[in-house]
């Protein structure tokens, strides 16, 4: 069979010019459609940026820094600096554990808690906004109300909201929706992040940049201070409880609950999971 006979006997080869034209048209349409979408997305993005620029441009000379514009002063390092201080801090912090069983008595003096929060207040923050509020609760009735709110939400969290794998991962820690430590611990420290500032008359003021990161850094310093004071704590982040707890404490709308810390001395015979922390080689990369 010669080439002409092969072409005439094959429907595909016989109509190849039409097929070629059809495929070429499909390719051209796809290219135009893709290019049109790409241009449309770029245009929308540019348009959005232009709107934002115009919005800020309207402020003109009204823009003022949130901080008072003062001359810088010489840096004064902290006191009692020690070259071995980092190692001493590590030895201190390696003993820190999450404690879920607290003694109601003896109760640490409130001044100790105040000093720990003072230390937390030295944390850096975006544009020096210091976007944090520490609510220290020691009244038994108020602690019971907090526990009631948290346990109601946690029951729903464990039974409905949380993924089964999450609940399974928590099993070795022996945690559930019952939070006895909320009434056992002599102190509860509720750490709120401030998403923006408020004036004395409740008017919204400056934006608080990186408020969650800033408040989280401060919370880490607080944990170090509590450990240095010989106090035990537990970092908790109650799901879906923030608004109710904020209202209970009468906090303003610009504050959102970030962390709830039970604080006190561990109960006699208190046990913790047999866990090991990662080695330095697993958490540090040197270049």
Swiss-Prot record:
Predominant location category: membrane
Single GO MF descriptor: iodide peroxidase activity
Keyword vocabulary terms for this entry: Cell membrane, Flavoprotein, FMN, Membrane, NADP, Oxidoreductase, Transmembrane, Transmembrane helix
InterPro entries reported in the protein's UniProt record: Nitroreductase, Nitroreductase-like, Nitroreductase/BluB
Transmembrane segments: 15-34
An individual GO BP term: tyrosine metabolic process
Binding-site positions, 3-iodo-L-tyrosine: 127, 154, 158, 179
Expression across tissues: Expressed in spermatocytes.
Record Pfam families: Nitroreductase
Bilayer topology: Single-pass membrane protein
Catalytic activity annotation: 2 iodide + L-tyrosine + 2 NADP(+) = 3,5-diiodo-L-tyrosine + 2 NADPH + H(+); iodide + L-tyrosine + NADP(+) = 3-iodo-L-tyrosine + NADPH; 3-iodo-L-tyrosine + iodide + NADP(+) = 3,5-diiodo-L-tyrosine + NADPH + H(+); L-tyrosine + chloride + NADP(+) = 3-chloro-L-tyrosine + NADPH
EC number, as in UniProt: 1.21.1.1
Note: Named condet in honor of Dr. Jean Francois Condet who discovered that ingestion of iodide could reduce goiter.
Function: Catalyzes the dehalogenation of halotyrosines such as 3-bromo-L-tyrosine, 3-chloro-L-tyrosine, 3-iodo-L-tyrosine and 3,5-diiodo-L-tyrosine. Activity towards 3-fluoro-L-tyrosine is weak. Important for male and female fertility. May be involved in maintaining the viability of sperm, both during development in the testes and storage in the female spermatheca.
Family from the record: Belongs to the nitroreductase family.
Protein name in UniProt: Iodotyrosine deiodinase
UniProt source species: Drosophila melanogaster
Gene responsible for this protein: Iyd
